[in-house]
Amino acid sequence: LKNNINYSHIPIILLTARATLQSKIEGIELGADAYIEKPFSTEYLLVKIATLLTNLEKLRKAFTSSPFVEARTIALSNADEKFLDKLTETIKKNISEPEFNVDILASEMNMSRSSLHRKIKSIAQITPNEYIQLERLKTAAQLLQSGNYKINEICYIVGFNSSSYFAKCFQKQFGVLPKEFCSSIRN
């Protein structure tokens, strides 16, 4: 299941009678997120599920709120990681194009718009439009960190047509204005 791009984002818990260390290792190597032996406590299972989901949500929040957390941190499987790598690469290739949108992204990913929406939403809990904008802003943060460009230049490099809209989006995403972000990096 973890190798199938349609199901790779779903956490897998193995409930099994096999209790050997080798069986546990095989289960985890095959992509299981947890391995629970029978007989098991229902309370333990519920706590394990809640913990897996809470940890996944923390990773997603870190990904969307921190400019330097990469997309692959929210991948639950190799298939998700490959998908996110290709997605990020495709966006970065077109990042300076203001008219780059979900339709173009879906076409370049060889997916329908609805399939792309479902997949991104299931992995990152954001829409494809939000994902494109997030990648634009993360790239802007990296460029700001480099110190090689002015804020006005960066806004156009990452595909924004307006520096004021760029600053507003940057602040909404990361909690600081680009100018404040630059100051915090230098200090």
Task: List each model region and its residues.
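C-terminal output helix
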Residues: 23, 40-49, 61
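The C-terminal output helix
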Residues: 50-66
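Basic, amphipathic alpha-helical hairpins
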Residues: 88-100, 120, 124, 141-150, ...
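Alpha4 helix (beta4-alpha4-beta5 surface) of REC/receiver domains from two-component response regulators
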Residues: 8, 19-34
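Basic/polar phosphate-binding segments, predominantly the helix-turn-helix DNA-binding elements
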Residues: 102-131, 157-180
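A Lys-centered signature of the CheY-like receiver
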Residues: 36-38
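Terminal helix-turn-helix DNA-binding modules in bacterial transcription factors
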Residues: 122-161, 183-187
